[in-house]
């Protein structure tokens, strides 16, 4: 969901209706009055995403943002909004189920509860 912050890097966006697909997106707001989003609508393949633990990673450099799924490069973004220092960013893991038709698809409430286990989340900064 867009916010009034400078922007966000979505490490992973996932809805149960997507089965073996996920999304990686970049949103920027404060320095872009028209709001821009990069590739949130593109679904990336993820073999057995609903089974076991998986590693999602983001590397943000001065020229690009790289997303990884289980150690494999899944997406590269080199467009507007990448340069470090252009604005602050929030890092997100988006797991928001919906009870109605929406971006995540149509849900059947009888399928609930959904569950996701997180072992750890780490953040590092390059020196």
Language model regions located:
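GH16 jelly-roll
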Residues: 1-127
């Amino acid at each position: 969901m867009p916010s009034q912050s400078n922007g966000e890097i979505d490490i992973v966006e996932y809805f149960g209706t997507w089965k073996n697909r996920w999304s990686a997106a970049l949103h920027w707001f404060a320095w872009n009055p028209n709001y821009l989003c990069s590739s949130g609508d593109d679904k990336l393949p993820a073999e057995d995403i609903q089974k076991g633990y998986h590693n999602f990673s983001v590397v943000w450099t001065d020229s690009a943002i790289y997303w990884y799924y289980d150690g494999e490069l899944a997406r590269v973004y080199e467009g507007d909004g990448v340069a470090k220092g252009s604005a602050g960013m929030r890092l997100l893991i988006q797991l928001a189920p919906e009870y109605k038709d929406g971006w995540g698809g149509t849900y059947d409430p009888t399928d609930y509860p959904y569950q996701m286990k997180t072992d750890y989340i780490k953040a590092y900064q390059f020196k």
